[in-house]
Design a protein with these regions (language model features):
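Extracytoplasmic gate region of multi-pass secondary transporters
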Residues: 43, 249-299, 390
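Extracellular/periplasmic helix-loop-helix junction of adjacent transmembrane segments
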Residues: 46-80
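Cytoplasmic membrane-interface "Motif A"-like loop-to-helix N-cap segments
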Residues: 91-102, 312-323
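C-terminal ends and interior cores of transmembrane alpha-helices
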Residues: 103-121, 325-338
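Hydrophobic core of transmembrane alpha-helices in multi-pass small-molecule transporters
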Residues: 122-141, 342-357
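Glycine-rich segments within core transmembrane alpha-helices of 12-TM secondary carriers
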Residues: 162-186, 381-393
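Multi-pass alpha-helical transporter architecture, strongest
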Residues: 213-220, 414-437
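C-terminal transmembrane helical hairpin of 12-TM major facilitator-type secondary transporters
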Residues: 316-361
Length: 437
């Protein structure tokens, strides 16, 4: 790889975030929140969409299978889109990718809200739905790495963990907004009214807000880091992804493991929890969902807290701390489900939810990749683990919960062990010789 000056890789340390940093963070977080909002409403409304976009004689179960298949195609397309967009982002600029990814999410989301149904156009309806979903997936694969990279190159190096922790918390807020929007629709309207046209509202709303955010992002500047490497003719001329694999394999694999912990923690502690609470504690759907909503809020706080700790302690120590706290809380929660009072379980669950954000220390990893290949490095880290491992957690946890009350604890314990080992390896290999930036 071409030699480049390390001074072009990060911005100098300084105290606090400046006003411009906060503006950048706000626009980055807004885009991320909207993308995950769009992602969630499709997942949650799949049973309804299956009735509208497939023939009635197909049968409800098969229609739902096909709708979820369209949703799953997103997981396959996500790494492809993310890696292509990252390649362009390392060659053409961060700001351009940062804006394009949001535009590619907003337009198909708006289009979904305006699509004709099977009753109107026949087989064209599911084909159009599939096309929208594929474009969405390409966008979401590019958005998160582009946002992490853009923000990391706009804020001082000693604030990168906090900034990307705030950004990752924004993704959790998007999941929360998507869930609350769908719940509100189901509470306010009858099933017939939703099928008659109300289902379009969250898609149109998400699309319009996304286009507004695109317009706002247009006013952001290119990062000073990218401008510096471009002016000094340090842009990588080969295939950035190949250089990531050749020279930064350890960073890539450790980052993939941390991202797995982050995704799997959300799946186990947040997404799979309502069903477990209803089965084991006899909670109503409303009570279980309330725990879930509070859990998502705490996970967002955890992203910010552990992101800041990554600035202070380094990624390695932060990962080890998160793993120990998560395992302790999970052990109390799962083994105390049928014995402890609800107050004690709530406290253990709150700590689990907070620690589900500890994987957000991944945001600090961005500055470990050299600037000319940085976006490709983060896109590979995020998308490869999301594609290979992201869909594994929910079905595995559902199966484990059927085997034993504490079934999901086994998966969490294995994840915590992996997270702690990765933290220890990272600390010894990358952080032992120098103070965390």
């Amino acid at each position: 790889m071409q030699h480049h000056n390390a001074n072009t890789d990060v911005l100098p340390a300084r105290q606090g975030l400046a006003r411009q940093d906060i503006k950048v963070l706000g626009l980055a977080s807004l885009g991320g929140a909207l993308e995950f909002y769009d992602f969630m409403i499709f997942a949650l409304m799949a049973p309804l969409l299956s009735q509208l976009f497939f023939p009635a004689d197909l049968g409800g179960a098969w229609a739902l299978v096909y709708t979820y298949a369209i949703f799953a195609i997103g997981y396959v397309m996500r790494p492809v889109g993310g890696l292509v967009m990252a390649h362009l982002g390392d060659r053409l600029g961060r700001k351009r990718m940062f804006t394009w990814s949001l535009l590619l999410m907003a337009m198909p989301t708006l289009a979904m809200g305006l699509l004709p149904m099977y009753a109107q156009v026949g087989v064209l309806a599911p084909i159009l739905l599939l096309l929208c979903r594929v474009v969405q997936a390409v966008a979401i694969g590019g958005e998160v790495p582009a946002a992490w990279t853009y923000v990391s190159e706009q804020v001082p190096v000693n604030q990168v963990g906090l900034a990307n922790g705030l950004l990752t918390a924004g993704l959790s807020v998007g999941i929360l907004l998507g869930s609350v929007t769908v719940l509100a629709l189901q509470a306010a309207f009858s099933n017939d009214a939703i099928l008659a046209g109300v289902w379009r509202v969250p898609f149109v709303l998400g699309g319009v807000l996304g286009l507004l955010a695109v317009w706002m992002r247009k006013h952001l500047q290119e990062t000073p880091i990218f401008m510096a490497i471009k002016q000094r003719r340090l842009l990588y001329q080969g295939l950035p992804l190949a250089e990531v694999w050749r020279s930064h394999k350890a960073l890539l694999l450790i980052g993939m493991g941390i991202n797995w912990f982050l995704l799997a923690s959300v799946a186990v502690v947040l997404l799979a929890m309502p069903k477990l609470l209803q089965q084991q504690l006899g909670m109503s759907a409303v009570q279980a969902t309330t725990w879930q909503v509070l859990g998502i809020a705490l996970q967002a706080m955890g992203c910010i807290t552990f992101g800041r700790l990554a600035d202070k302690l380094g990624i390695g120590r932060t990962a080890m701390l998160g793993a120990v706290l998560m395992l302790s809380a999970a052990t109390v929660f799962y083994f105390g489900l049928q014995a402890l009072p609800v107050t004690a379980l709530a406290m253990a669950y709150a700590l689990m939810a907070l620690c589900a954000g500890s994987g957000a220390c991944l945001g600090k990893l961005v500055v470990r990749f050299p600037a000319p290949i940085r976006l490709s490095g983060m896109a590979a880290t995020y998308n490869l683990s999301s594609a290979l491992l992201g869909g594994l957690s929910l079905p595995l946890v559902a199966w484990l919960n059927l085997q034993a009350v504490w079934g999901a604890w086994l998966y969490l314990a294995a994840l915590c062990a992996m997270f702690a080992v990765l933290g220890w390896v990272f600390q010894k290999r990358f952080e032992a010789a120098c103070k965390p930036q």
